[in-house]
Amino acid sequence: MVRSGKGIQNKNATEVTEFILLGLSDNPDLQGVLFALFLIIYTMTLVGNLGMMALIKIDRSLHTPMYFFLSSLSFVDASYSSSVTPKMLVNLMAEDKSISFNGCATQFFFFGSFLGTECFLLAMMAYDRYAAIWNPLLYPVLMSGRICFMLVSTSFLAGFGNAAIHTGMTFRLSFCGSNKINHFYCDTPPLLKLSCSDTHINGIVIMAFSSFNVISCVLIVLISYLCILIAILKMPSAEGRHKAFSTCASHLMAVTIFFGTILFMYLRPTSSYSMEQDKVVSVFYTVVIPMLNPLIYSLKNKDVKKAVKKILHNYVV
């Protein structure tokens, strides 16, 4: 998916100081519809994720490792959606669709940081579910408050560190030709396509880091769930198996949607790359997935439902 560069840069060309985000569609009849649709989705994303964080903070019964991770995930979802969606909404209604060079680099960095953090965080959550089901007696020791904090901190450090490398590698390049990004946010492939520098090294580094990070996270998830499956099958009672599976079902669904989209997006061969297809998939994981996660984790979660009812009874009734 990452393309090689343009060869030797033209030193006499004027360096780009801002970019133009072409967006999802140039059809003016669709702009208002898309604005209304994405505004609704973004509002639901903020309400769902910030509401989940507040609920976990308020209700002491949710002060467990599982919900500590979920609260962190909600923060990450709200953050990486907010790094892209507000600018996209503005561009849908504004004639000026420009973004400054530094603004593009900032968006690129924070989106990559939170996206990478989510990748690692979902892997840590899979390990948490494994620890809870494989050995419930040792679970408080294996997932103490200190260990949970270290795992979440490591996820953030890995996500932000990875994004810092990508941002430095991308924005050290020269952009001296067209400044029109065929996307609704600053993403790697369209930026490398615009560069008049040799992007061969960028392609190698980005593919190596992306592949390692995604594959390592996926392996942690797969190994954790394989151990979980073995533990569930060994349980003597059907009720115990059902209860154990129900605690993992929502996370498994979220993991499948997220990593399935990321694997399709970033690890498919260059020959199958299509910018229009890329935009559609990008909408799904930048806008839709952050909205879905609070719904996935709360709809069939008895603890969350109970906490919501308790708060409604205490503060509304």
Curated annotation (Swiss-Prot):
It comes from the Eukaryota. It holds the Pfam family 7tm_4. Its main location: membrane. GO terms for biological process: G protein-coupled receptor signaling pathway; sensory perception of smell. It is a multi-pass membrane protein. It is found in: Cell membrane. It comes from Mus musculus (Mouse). This is Olfactory receptor 5AP2. The chain crosses the membrane at residues 33-53, 62-82, 107-127, 141-161, 204-224, 245-265, 279-299.
